[in-house]
């Protein structure tokens, strides 16, 4: 029996004006819907970014008034860093911003050439998508490092953490892993892998948290990550990527020298010099930057970035923090980080309930196969047999994935297609040997039981 008593889905649906077009959107894995507060914030940010910021009086020795001529757009950069820091349990000065996590991981891999030389190793995993695989493969090939692979359990899609005790060695320079697979939904024991990495090497542990960001309370320290990557779009925000570093000390270690001056000038145009750094007594002073942070931004924050888009980052994290209500139906109170901790588990439980309905329904349809939830002899696994996020993929015997997708679309249900070459994990699991692809169902907090029933009726009509 599906129980949503602790999550006010009608209220949450009202936060998405895009749902009024009549479509059932189950493609959150690739194209999440934007809440109205995010689109409104972006619109206001584009209008206000070039305007001069008002001059406020200076109060106290540890603060400084804005300089004359400061634009409002510069505050959007600062608020975006603060929002990402709240989302992952970090400090704003540890946040690097870019156009996407793919671009940022690319830049990170290129900038670590001194670590990826001959004799060093890079450890990658099959559960990651291309954003956290391809940049490291290119960098390893260019600079001479060897690549080692962590393999998934091909029956479930889970990435076992125990294998890293053999894969990681003193020569390991980088270990990159996804916190969850975006198509199958299986969650990786990142903390266990992180403990192994730090115990056996001085390698950098890079975690792609993109798939778990809409559902899990992320804490970079608990995960043991040195660098954490995500796209704000995955939580219903604008197309902005972020890298979050564990500490300023790590930033200084990874970037001991500034890049070429031309890169420094490009980064300066993005406003890298305007943020927070330790002041007298360890307190923060506005307008200054720790040298290690500045060097990291000069290396990674290349080119310009729309301050209008940055204006929607804080609204996206606020939306995530305000999804759930307390027992009386009132919004949760406290800091944004506290509201994330209190509300996200309730939202995740609700979406898990919908995902269980989808899995149970597909298991009851002849010829339907839910990837990672069936054994060798087509016995069905329980949805909760492994830790997962509410994402799943399936295929139908004898029916091309494009045809399934088209039938769903004709019935008003929007899903995603995973073609051959788009998923290393599905390739290893043999999905593309028996099918032309798979259909990915990306559930979100705005979906309903009615949406699930509509999906299942459309799939059933194919047989």
Locate each region found by the language model.
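Pyridoxal 5′-phosphate
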Residues: 1-463
């Amino acid at each position: 029996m599906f129980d949503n008593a602790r999550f006010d889905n009608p209220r949450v649906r009202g936060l998405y004006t895009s749902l009024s077009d009549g479509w059932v959107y189950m493609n959150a894995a690739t194209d999440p819907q934007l809440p109205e507060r995010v689109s409104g914030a972006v619109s206001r940010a584009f209008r206000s970014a070039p305007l001069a910021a008002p001059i406020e009086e200076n109060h106290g020795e540890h603060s400084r008034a804005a300089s004359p001529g400061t634009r409002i757009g510069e505050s959007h950069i600062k608020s975006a860093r603060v929002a990402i820091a709240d989302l992952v349990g970090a400090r704003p000065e540890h946040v690097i911003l870019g156009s996407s996590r793919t671009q940022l991981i690319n830049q990170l891999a290129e900038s670590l050439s001194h670590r990826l030389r001959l004799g060093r190793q890079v450890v990658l995993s099959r559960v990651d998508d291309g954003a956290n695989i391809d940049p490291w493969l290119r960098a390893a090939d260019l600079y001479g490092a060897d690549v080692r692979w962590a393999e998934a359990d091909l029956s479930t899609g889970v990435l076992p953490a125990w294998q890293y005790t053999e894969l990681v060695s003193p020569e390991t320079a980088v270990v990159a892993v996804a916190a969850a697979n975006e198509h199958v939904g299986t969650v990786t024991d990142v903390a266990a892998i992180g403990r192994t990495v730090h115990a056996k090497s001085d390698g950098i542990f890079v975690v792609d948290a993109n798939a778990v960001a809409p559902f899990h309370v992320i804490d970079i320290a608990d995960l043991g990550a040195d660098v954490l990557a995500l796209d704000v779009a995955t939580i219903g925000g604008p197309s902005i990527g972020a890298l979050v570093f564990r500490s300023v000390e790590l930033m200084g270690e990874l970037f001991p020298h500034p890049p070429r001056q031309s890169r420094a000038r490009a980064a300066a145009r993005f406003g890298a010099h305007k943020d927070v750094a330790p002041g007298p007594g360890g307190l923060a002073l506005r307008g200054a930057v720790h040298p290690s942070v500045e060097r990291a931004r000069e290396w990674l924050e290349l080119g310009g970035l729309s301050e209008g888009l940055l204006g929607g980052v804080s609204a996206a994290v606020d939306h995530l923090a305000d999804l759930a209500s307390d027992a009386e139906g009132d919004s949760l109170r406290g800091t944004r980080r506290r509201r994330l901790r209190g509300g996200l588990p309730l939202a995740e439980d609700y979406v898990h309930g919908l995902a269980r309905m989808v899995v149970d329904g597909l298991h009851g349809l002849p010829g339907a196969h839910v990837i990672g939830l069936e054994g060798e002899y087509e016995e069905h696994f329980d949805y909760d047999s492994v830790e997962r996020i509410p994402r799943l993929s399936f295929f139908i015997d004898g029916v091309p994935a494009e045809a399934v997708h088209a039938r769903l679309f004709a019935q008003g249900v929007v899903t995603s297609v995973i073609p051959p070459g788009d998923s290393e994990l599905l390739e290893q699991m043999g999905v593309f040997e028996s099918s032309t692809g798979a259909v990915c169902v990306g559930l979100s907090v705005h979906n309903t039981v009615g949406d699930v029933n509509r999906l299942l009726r459309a799939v059933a009509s194919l047989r």
